[in-house]
């Protein structure tokens, strides 16, 4: 492989670390990684790639033309950076699906619909969907290869890290305060020891970009007091009975016992390999139910984004 790949990462510190860890494990030969601080790092926060310090650039000083690929995990109001990078010749991996509503931007989940990368050159942008959608797509893909589905219901239990690193810190702080009998401020949104509904727009549309034949998917999401790990309870229904026998794969691990986000975090802590864990599979009338868990930072975002980059590179983009 060509050893001249220059890669920029535009994400918060914690996610940037996980992307770099995954790049170090990739077969891609990368000459340089840089951080673009669209979300400013703390003074003591530094990234290392292959034991070397990584330069940290402000969005105002970056020359996007210096990079071949950009990992972007910013908010909708920051999409001007995506446009600038793409216009200057970079291939931009939109990690959070903020561009997924654009008809000429492909929405791709690795191993599921990589043929859509043919559309990449229209804008030099490809969207990885929201972690809720990518996790669901990976579990539905084997079913849709065998049968048609007329309805999918999914309830996602969202950890603090799904929002951002600041929310993780808030949850930790609130938990400690409440355990020590210190009440929260009246105006403070309570995260610890509580749950509440979470609204994420356009998830059904993102899923249909991946599976055009699936036009009835209902998403429910609940913010839960867990630090890391996205869990989903899924019911997939057809017009007739079907036999769902999932297999272990590169990305999916079948589990005989129930895996929760906390158990998954404990088991994968310190391990290079991360997977989407599937358990509690049971038949229902004309359908199937199952439970899936993944570390949405290390798996849904970092690993899938790097897998997407590898697919893009292998197709010559």
Curated annotation (Swiss-Prot):
InterPro entries: NAD(P)-bd_dom_sf
Gene behind the chain: usg
Family in the record: Belongs to the aspartate-semialdehyde dehydrogenase family.
Source species taxonomy: Bacteria, Pseudomonadati, Pseudomonadota, Gammaproteobacteria, Pasteurellales
UniProt-recorded name of the protein: USG-1 protein homolog
Superkingdom per UniProt: Bacteria
Alphabetical list of Gene3D superfamilies matching this protein: Dihydrodipicolinate Reductase, domain 2 (3.30.360.10), NAD(P)-binding Rossmann-like Domain (3.40.50.720)
Natural source organism: Haemophilus influenzae (strain ATCC 51907 / DSM 11121 / KW20 / Rd)
């Amino acid at each position: 492989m060509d050893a001249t790949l220059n890669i920029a990462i535009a994400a918060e510190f914690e996610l940037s670390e996980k992307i770099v860890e995954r790049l170090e494990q990739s077969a891609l030969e990368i000459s340089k990684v840089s951080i673009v601080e669209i979300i400013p790092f703390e003074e003591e926060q530094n990234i290392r790639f292959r034991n070397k310090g990584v330069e940290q650039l402000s969005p105002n000083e970056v020359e996007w033309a210096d990079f071949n690929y950009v990992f972007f995990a910013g908010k909708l109001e920051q999409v001007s950076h995506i446009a600038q990078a793409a216009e200057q010749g970079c291939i931009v991996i939109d990690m959070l699906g903020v561009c997924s509503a654009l008809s000429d931007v492909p929405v791709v989940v690795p191993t599921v619909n990589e043929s859509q990368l043919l559309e990449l050159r229209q804008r030099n942008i490809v969207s990885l969907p929201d972690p809720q959608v990518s996790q669901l797509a990976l579990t539905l893909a084997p079913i849709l290869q065998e049968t048609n589905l007329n309805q999918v219901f999914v309830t996602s239990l969202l950890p603090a890290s799904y929002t951002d690193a600041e929310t993780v810190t808030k949850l930790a702080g609130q938990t400690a305060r409440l355990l020590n009998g210190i009440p929260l401020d009246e105006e403070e949104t309570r995260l610890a020891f509580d749950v509440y509904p979470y609204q994420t727009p356009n998830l059904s549309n993102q899923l249909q970009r991946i599976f055009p034949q699936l036009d009835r998917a209902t998403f429910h999401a609940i913010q839960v007091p867990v630090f890391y790990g996205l869990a989903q309870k899924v019911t997939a229904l057809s017009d007739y009975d079907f036999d769902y026998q999932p297999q272990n794969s590169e990305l999916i691990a079948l589990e005989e016992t129930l895996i929760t986000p906390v158990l998954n975090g404990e088991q994968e802590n310190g391990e290079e390999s991360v997977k989407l864990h599937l358990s509690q599979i049971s038949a229902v009338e004309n359908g199937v139910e199952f439970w899936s868990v993944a570390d949405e930072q290390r798996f849904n975002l970092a690993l899938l984004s790097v897998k997407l980059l590898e697919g893009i590179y292998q197709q010559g983009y």
